[in-house]
Amino acid sequence: MQHKVVSIGDIKVANNLPFVLFGGMNVLESRDLAMRICEHYVTVTQKLDIPYVFKASFDKANRSSIHSYRGPGLDEGMKIFQELKETFGVKIITDVHEPSQAQPVSEVVDVIQLPAFLARQTDLVEAMAKTGAVINVKKPQFVSPGQMGNIVEKFKEGGNDQVILCDRGSNFGYDNLVVDMLGFHVMMQASEGAPVIFDVTHSLQCRDPFGAASGGRRGQVAELARAGMAVGLAGLFLEAHPDPDHARCDGPSALPLAKLEPFLAQIKAIDSLVKSFPELDTSK
């Protein structure tokens, strides 16, 4: 299989290259917390020599409850991202929810993300494609891996082939997700070798069927991440928090920030081992 390389500045993302970490926090809770979390990620990834892109949302437009915290909004969010870039020299990824957000966001961040719930919205796809930015597409929980090729094709028709695909689990009955390890390879095939990354923390969400917030299983984040990265992927998508029990969004699935270094050391060891093997075609 041919492996497409997507460049985020000097960072190369491909399924056969050393993995890239897309990591940070779920939503911007405050400027100071974003600075603290980003600094820790930068320190750890530099120590372990892992290519790194900071992740956070400026607006969580798809919260379960109308009363849930959404974030600081577009203007304040872009100010925080700009300060993070100037202070730490990081690349940044964030999600957009409306076509009108695509251009102003692309002027600040390096990768714009198409949320899973919106991945088939053609107007949003077209607006994102027109920016020319690198795109990260979250696979909807209700879409099969093979169907992701159609979304990539929409971006190509819009003039943008700089697309990364991200798996964040698939519906498994009601209120539960499961990760299909075979699906990673299917996504690569369907997209003609596009980089595929794994959102491990969102894949650990589980819902109270009558509740107003997502639960999670952060006690299993290491096991699931090790399994996924053993497939041989372009990157890992991860959220961490210094106090997950009091995070304002998705704390139950967030990695405790203090565990970041030992966690990433394991992931890098697995990624390096898997990619040291020659590719093995067992189809014939």
Curated annotation (Swiss-Prot):
GO molecular function: 3-deoxy-8-phosphooctulonate synthase activity
Keyword Transferase in record: yes
The keyword Cytoplasm belongs to this UniProt entry's keyword annotation: yes
Domain of life: Bacteria
UniProt-listed InterPro entries: Aldolase_TIM, DAHP1/KDSA, KDO8P_synthase
UniProt xrefs under SUPFAM superfamilies: Aldolase
Family to which this protein belongs: Belongs to the KdsA family.
Protein name: 2-dehydro-3-deoxyphosphooctonate aldolase
Species this chain originates from: Proteus mirabilis (strain HI4320)
